[in-house]
C-alpha cells in the first residue's frame, strides 16, 4: 500500500468513527443501496418534499393510474399526427397550389429526367405558367415538342390545376448596349453579315 492509499484509508476510518460516535449509520461502501433513504419521509413535511397539507394523506398521483381491478388503464393518445395538422393548415390557408408549384420546381429532374434537366432550368411559376430556360435553341425546340407529355406528368404528380402552360425560352443573346467600351449609335452592323 502506498502512502497516498494509506492516507485515504485513515481518512475513511476517521469518518466512520465519527459517524458511530454520533449514533449514525455507517454506510457499507460495498453495498449498492448504502446511500438510499431507509426511513420514509413524513407526509406533511414541506422541507422534505411533502405536499404540506398536514392531513397525513399524500394526495400526489404517482405512476400510471389503475382501474378498479388494479390493472393499468390504457393510455389514450389525444395528439393528432403532425402530417394531419400540417395538411389541415395548408388547406385552410390556401397554400396547396403554391406548395405543389414549389414541388415541381424542386423535383424538376425527377419529372423530366436527368438528361433534360441538365440542359434546362425552371425560372419561375406565375399564373399557372411554368417559365423554363434552356441551354440552347435546339433544347428549347425539343422541349416545346415534348410540352404535352411534360404537362401530363406534372398533372399526374401534383394535380391538374397547378401548371396549365409551359413557357420555354432559349438562351439570352448578349447585349451590345452595355459595357465600358460602349459607343453610341446603331451598334455593330456588318458583324453578322
Curated annotation (Swiss-Prot):
Region called Disordered, residue ranges = 17-74
Family annotation (Pfam families)? DciA
Composition-biased stretches (Gly residues)? 47-56
Instruction: Spell out the InterPro entries in the cross-references.
Output: DciA-like, UPF0232_actinobac
User: Which PANTHER family did the record assign?
Assistant: UPF0232 PROTEIN SCO3875 (PTHR36456:SF1)
UniProt similarity note: Belongs to the UPF0232 family.
Task: State the name under which the record lists this protein.
Answer: UPF0232 protein CE0005
